[in-house]
Every structure is written in structure tokens, then in C-alpha cells.
């Protein structure tokens, strides 16, 4: 009994130790991969290829006397945040680094070797890639181009506003030979791609034009549909050919049987109905079971079709007796062959499954050279620079022509305004314009002039609707110059042209109160003066706001857009003829 209890205790202890080990295994975090990723990222940041392009990090190194950079700076980078935010873990990962070294405290790092001059063959080692997928990233490009050599630097331009990639990238290799290899192996543009390389995306205010994307997608869909239709047509033709072949063979087989049936149909009608029924039953039972007997029957019928009718009947009965035995033999042979095929097929399937399992254990995204053909266009950077020069020259020429057309449109519009009016009326208009212009300029310079009894205060128990809705409800009664309202406010002010207009709105309070629960009152006294001061202060603040200076191409494009909008507005206007015209 004691031995049994001792054995049970040992078993229990072993189980508890196993459970503890399992718990420890679960608790253990996978740090090796994280350490390797941290070391790789920091080595890249402090490498020659990156520091020659990364101005911020280079300046941080130059600022410090010893060339040390604090690890806390690296933790602030987004890519490092994804890996870790622990400075000690970063220091641990960089102990065995070949590029950087730690200080004695383990809180700062620096390059082991000083940064040299920028290499001159950088452009020759760099490759330009276009027709990239929409959600492309550095790891994808490194995986694809890493087959051709050691990728040192990858640059993927993005739109500033949206953050989407522009569809092209630059890949820098360690040697010129590797870059040439990438151009040779990975330059496989699809048939749909434009003949001339070089993507210079069309943008409006540094944003991709969505309409162009939609058009491109529609074109791609149409092409796909066309291909599918062609494939369907080819398949349909093949099927038709197969059906015609089968029908021809059937026709060949059915000719003798039809002749036999003709002979049978020519029999006199003196035969009794009982014999006919028996014959029909026998034929119906024999036909579905066996198809192979048709040839023998047809051949016998062909041979003896000219003989007497009684002989034909005897031959048919003999064939019917022979057919089942032949069919049973054939069925046995077929069953044996199918069993053999099944055995061989099972063996093949099992071997294939084993090989698939082995492949799945490895990384799924590994690709060997030549296995997949990625539709990319790859050029040397020097070729791309030549294309860029051509593009800039074309842009310059187009902008010059646009400038000329804008100046011509302006001169034509001035000629129309001056030449279209008679001289006498023109003189009067000049005087009136000269009188009106200074007054308008004064109003614009000083802002709205103080007029008492023009401002109406609107108070609501609930947040007021949008400015447009308030304006529309008031404009139905009288002309509104301005509505001072912020979203979610329960109070607002409306400025009218004359005190009579404001009074008309107050008089129509009953009509407004039916639709909206508003309280209306005209401002007067100190409240009115304070509000007018507020108007002037707000106006001055608006004028003092910094404006974006548009120069060069942007300035020209904005001018052209304004002219286009003005023309469209003129075209959309209704031409109204008077009764006497």
C-alpha cells in the first residue's frame, strides 16, 4: 500500500512539473525575432545609403560632439514604435551590431565609422520601377528585387494630402551589375501598359484626380470583359465542334437501324396486335441495358435487309439473347480497370498531400526566380531623368501657350466691353463708373458702415439649423446681407440692408413662429454698438490672415480655372428677349 501511495505521489509531482513547464513556455515571449528586426532597422537608419538622404538624422548626429544620438529619439520614430518602445530592449539588440556602438551607460548610440562623401555612382546603381500595386510597401519591393541582389535603399513617393503611393518607386542596389540584372529580369510590362514609360501623376492641389482613376478602372473592366467573351466564344466553338463530331458518329450508327425500322414499317397490317406488343417490350428492355449491341444488330440488318421478312425477325431475337452476356463481360472489365485506377489515384493523392504539407511549413510568400512573372516596368534612373527633362520641357511649353491664351481672352473681353457700347452712352457710363468706383473702394476699405435698426437677433431654445436655412427663411420676407451663425449655436444675428427690411421680418414673426420656435428682436443702444464693433474686429482679423502665395504654374492654373468657371456661368444663363425685339 505504501509503495502504491508513493507511486501516486511521484506521478502527481511529475504532472505538476509538466504543467509548470507548459505555463513557463506560454509566458516566454518570442524576443529573438524582435531583436533581429530592431537591429536591422537601426543599421539601415545609420547606414551610408540612408544618412546621405536623411537630413534630420544627419543633423542630429552633427549636433552632438561625439556623434552620439539618444535612444529615446529612435523610440519616437513610427517604425520603432511598431517594434518596441523599450530603450533597454533596443540597447540589447544593438550590442552585436556591425554598424553602430553603444556608450558605457547604454542610453546612446553612434556609428562605428565616420560618414564619408556621397558616392558618385548612386544613380547608376538605382532603378526606377512603375506599374506597382496600389498598397505597395517596402517589404514587398525588397522581397521582389532582393532576388537580383542586395537592396540598399527603397524610396516610394506618396501624396502629401492622402498618403497614397504614386504608383512608382526607386530601388538602390549595392552594385551596378545587380541593377542591370533587375532591369533584365524584372522588366515585364503588361500589354495594357502605355508604350512610353514614366508616370507623372495628374493632380489638383497635390491630390490625385479621382475621375481619372475611375476611368482607368472602367477601361480595365471593359478589357477583362472582352477577354472573357473571347474565351467563351472559343469554348463555345470547341463545344460545337465536339457536338457535331458526336452527332456525325451517331448518324453513322443510326443509319442501319433506321433502314431496319423502314423494313419493319413496310410489314402488312395483318399481324396481330399481341405480337407487336411483345416485340416492343423485348426491344425496350434490351435497349437501355446495353448500347454496344447496336452495331452487331445494324450490321446483320444491313446484310439481310433484302431477304424475306421472317428471317429478319429471327435474327433480331438471336441478337437480343446474345447482347446481355456480352454486356456483362464488358462491365466486369470496366469495374476491374476502375478499381486499378482508383488505387493508383489514391497513391498519387497521398504523395501530393505530403509534398504540399512540407511546402506549407516553409514561408508561404517565398518566390523563386522564374516561377512568377510580376507585370512591372523597370528602367535605369538615368533613363528616367531624361524622361523627366522631356516632361518639364513639355510642361513649360504648355504653360507658355496657356499664358498667351489667358492674355488674349482678357484683351478680347476688354475690347467687347469698350467697343460694344456707343460713344455717348459710353461717356455717361465712364462718368457713372468713375463716380461709383471710389465709393465702392471706400466701402471695401473701411467695411460696412454703421446703420441703426438693421441687425435682428434670433434666439432659439434648440440649436439653430445651418446658416443657409436661416438665410432662406428670412430672405423670403426681405433681403438679407449677412447671417452671423456658428454650428450648434442657439443665438445668431442677421444684418439687413435697411431698417424697413428688419422691421418687416419682425412684423412677420407669426408666420416664422409657425415653422420655427424663434424669438426675434431688433438690436438697439449699447448692444447694437457692441455688435458693430465686433463686426469690424472680425473683419480686420480676417484680412490679417496669412494667405498662400501662388506662383508659377499654380498661379496660371488658378487663373485659367477662374476664366473657365466664368464662361460656364455665362453659358448656363438664360437669354431673355423683350416683347418688342
UniProtKB/Swiss-Prot annotation:
PROSITE patterns to which the protein is assigned, alphabetical: HTH_LA (PS50961), RRM (PS50102), XRRM (PS51939)
Residue positions where N-acetylmethionine is found in the record: 1
Role: RNA-binding protein that specifically binds distinct small nuclear RNA (snRNAs) and regulates their processing and function. Specifically binds the 7SK snRNA (7SK RNA) and acts as a core component of the 7SK ribonucleoprotein (RNP) complex, thereby acting as a negative regulator of transcription elongation by RNA polymerase II. The 7SK RNP complex sequesters the positive transcription elongation factor b (P-TEFb) in a large inactive 7SK RNP complex preventing RNA polymerase II phosphorylation and subsequent transcriptional elongation.
SUPFAM superfamilies: RNA-binding domain, RBD, Winged helix' DNA-binding domain
Limits of the xRRM domain: 449-562
Lineage, highest ranks first: Eukaryota, Metazoa, Chordata, Craniata, Vertebrata
Pfam families: La (PF05383), RRM_1 (PF00076), RRM_3 (PF08777)
InterPro entries, per the entry: La_dom_prot, La_HTH, La_xRRM, LARP7_La, LARP7_RRM1, LARP7_RRM2, Lupus_La, Nucleotide-bd_a/b_plait_sf
Protein name: La-related protein 7
Domain (RRM): residue spans on this chain: 125-203
Subcellular location: Nucleus, Nucleoplasm
Any one annotated GO CC term: 7SK snRNP
Glycyl lysine isopeptide (Lys-Gly) (interchain with G-Cter in SUMO2) crosslink site(s): 237, 410
Ranges where the HTH La-type RNA-binding domain occurs: 28-122
Region Disordered, residue ranges: 1-28, 188-368, 410-440
Keywords: Acetylation, Differentiation, Isopeptide bond, mRNA processing, mRNA splicing, Nucleus, Phosphoprotein, RNA-binding, Spermatogenesis, Transcription, Transcription regulation, Ubl conjugation
Molecular functions (GO terms): 7SK snRNA binding; U6 snRNA binding
The encoding gene: LARP7
Keyword Lipid metabolism included in the entry's annotation: no
Keyword Translocase: no
Quaternary structure, from the entry: Core component of the 7SK RNP complex, at least composed of 7SK RNA, LARP7, MEPCE, HEXIM1 (or HEXIM2) and P-TEFb (composed of CDK9 and CCNT1/cyclin-T1). Interacts with METTL16. Interacts with RBM7; upon genotoxic stress this interaction is enhanced, triggering the release of inactive P-TEFb complex from the core, yielding to P-TEFb complex activation. Associates with box C/D small nucleolar ribonucleoprotein (snoRNP) complexes.
